Every structure is written in structure tokens, then in C-alpha cells.
Swiss-Prot record:
It catalyses: 2-C-methyl-D-erythritol 4-phosphate + CTP + H(+) = 4-CDP-2-C-methyl-D-erythritol + diphosphate. One of its GO terms (biological process) is isopentenyl diphosphate biosynthetic process, methylerythritol 4-phosphate pathway. It comes from Haemophilus influenzae (strain 86-028NP). Pfam families: IspD. Catalyzes the formation of 4-diphosphocytidyl-2-C-methyl-D-erythritol from CTP and 2-C-methyl-D-erythritol 4-phosphate (MEP). This is 2-C-methyl-D-erythritol 4-phosphate cytidylyltransferase. The lineage of its organism: Bacteria, Pseudomonadati, Pseudomonadota, Gammaproteobacteria, Pasteurellales. Its EC number is 2.7.7.60. Keywords: Isoprene biosynthesis, Nucleotidyltransferase, Transferase. NCBIfam families: ispD. The keyword GTP-binding does not apply. Belongs to the IspD/TarI cytidylyltransferase family. IspD subfamily. Pathway: Isoprenoid biosynthesis; isopentenyl diphosphate biosynthesis via DXP pathway; isopentenyl diphosphate from 1-deoxy-D-xylulose 5-phosphate: step 2/6. The gene is ispD. The record marks 17, 24 as: Transition state stabilizer. One of its GO terms (molecular function) is 2-C-methyl-D-erythritol 4-phosphate cytidylyltransferase activity.
Length: 225
């Protein structure tokens, strides 16, 4: 049976670290919001049949955007995990797989989605990059306790790619247990699965701090050349 590919974008966060007057996904670069740039990547990828966008109930910005008919809005939750779960609960398709992607990660390239979709193991897969910087563990006083061995450490990115039913069950269970679910893979891991790590690109950055905007603008400009 052919699997359908659906993208879910949690976009209900406020992005407090950006120190901006609006959620970071609505900041503008090159004439479009970060969210629109991210949606463009998914809309232009042929295998993605639908995009589910989880936004805050009182979001005053989403109505100002011209959204493609392939985009379905759902109400976001108080956490990322709840927003993603709400998106998954809106999926009725059988044999569906989901690409969960950060709304503020606009520089994703189609070649990286290709690599994820090559994975057919139901354990799923995530984009990630090997850690190259030296990693220090700190105590409560922000003093170094030890230097970590980085040889087997990877930095998780998105998209993260899983069968809808498996991810839905994993997130539901994790939320009920009060687990610290920082990404979809962490819920999958708690359910006993071992997702694949697919090497991504460092320019697939998540805009988190003010200084990230200039770098994202550079990458977006380069990608359009």
C-alpha cells in the first residue's frame, strides 16, 4: 500500500528568546514571514499531500497570511507535544507518515526530505548533524563539571519522520506520563523504538535568537539563486 506523506508544523509558540514584539514565526525576511518560507518548502515538495498547521487559539497573525488550500489549521496546545498531537489527531488517512517540522526552520532543502523519505523502517528517522563543538557539562553555578565525549553525540533537527499511528500513540502516552518531550523522537524513544539518524545540513537552522535572522536571510537568499 502506498503511504501518504503529511507535514505537521507546530506554530503555537511565542519564541521568547527572540525578544521580539511578535512570535518568531511571524518575523519577516525577504518580504515573507519565516512561517511562509517554511510552508513554501513543504508546499513545493511533490510527495507532501497536506500540511497541518497548529496555531494558538488567539493567534492574531495567521489570518493575515494567504494560505494554500493544502494547509489545514488546527488549534495548538500549551506545549509543542500537545500541538503536534492535535495535528496528528486531524489525520484520518490510513498508512500515513508524518513529517514534523519546526515553523521557524525555513532553510530546509528538498534533498534532505528525500533522504528521510528513503527510510521505510517503522522506527522512523530524524534529520540530525554530528556534534562538532566541544560539549561541557555544567553545575548549578554554571561551572564546568566535565567535558563530554562527543564521538556519539548528534544534534537533533527537523523534519522528524514517523508513521502517524506510532507517533500519535507515543505522544499520547508520554504526555499522560508527564514525560519531558522536547521533540517527537524523544516520545518515540520512550515507547521503545530506536529512530534512525539521517545526516542533515548545518544550514537547516532553527531561528531562535535575534542573531539567527541574518544567517537565515543569507541562506534563504543563497538557496533562491
Amino acid at each position: 500500500m502506498t503511504r501518504s506523506i503529511i507535514a505537521v508544523l507546530p506554530a503555537a509558540g511565542v519564541g521568547s528568546r527572540m525578544q521580539a514584539d511578535k512570535p518568531k514565526q511571524y518575523l519577516t525576511l525577504l518580504g515573507k514571514t519565516l512561517l511562509e518560507h517554511t510552508l513554501d518548502v513543504m508546499l513545493s515538495y511533490p510527495a507532501v499531500s497536506k500540511i497541518i498547521l497548529a496555531v494558538s487559539k488567539d493567534d492574531p497573525y495567521i489570518s493575515t497570511l494567504s494560505l494554500d488550500p493544502k494547509i489545514q489549521l488546527v488549534e495548538g496546545g500549551t506545549t509543542r507535544a500537545e500541538s503536534v498531537l492535535n495535528g496528528l489527531n486531524a489525520i484520518a488517512e490510513k498508512n500515513a507518515w508524518v513529517l514534523v517540522h519546526d515553523a521557524a526552520r525555513p532553510c530546509l532543502q528538498h534533498a534532505d526530505i528525500d533522504k528521510l523519505l528513503a527510510i521505510e523502517d517503522k522506527q522512523g528517522a530524524i534529520l540530525a548533524i554530528p556534534v562538532t563543538d566541544t560539549i561541557k557539562r555544567a553545575d548549578n553555578q554554571q561551572c564546568i563539571v566535565k567535558t563530554e565525549d562527543r564521538s556519539q553525540l548528534w544534534q537533533a533537527m527537523t523534519p522528524q519522520f514517523f508513521p502517524v499511528d506510532i507517533l500519535r500513540d507515543a505522544l499520547s502516552t508520554g504526555i499522560q506520563q508527564g514525560a519531558n518531550i522536547t521533540d517527537e523522537a524523544s516520545a518515540i524513544e520512550l515507547a521503545g523504538f530506536r529512530p534512525h539518524l539521517v545526516a542533515g545540513r548545518s544550514d537547516n537552522l532553527k531561528v531562535t535568537r535575534p542573531e539567527d535572522l541574518a544567517l537565515a536571510e543569507f541562506y534563504l537568499t543563497r538557496n533562491k539563486l
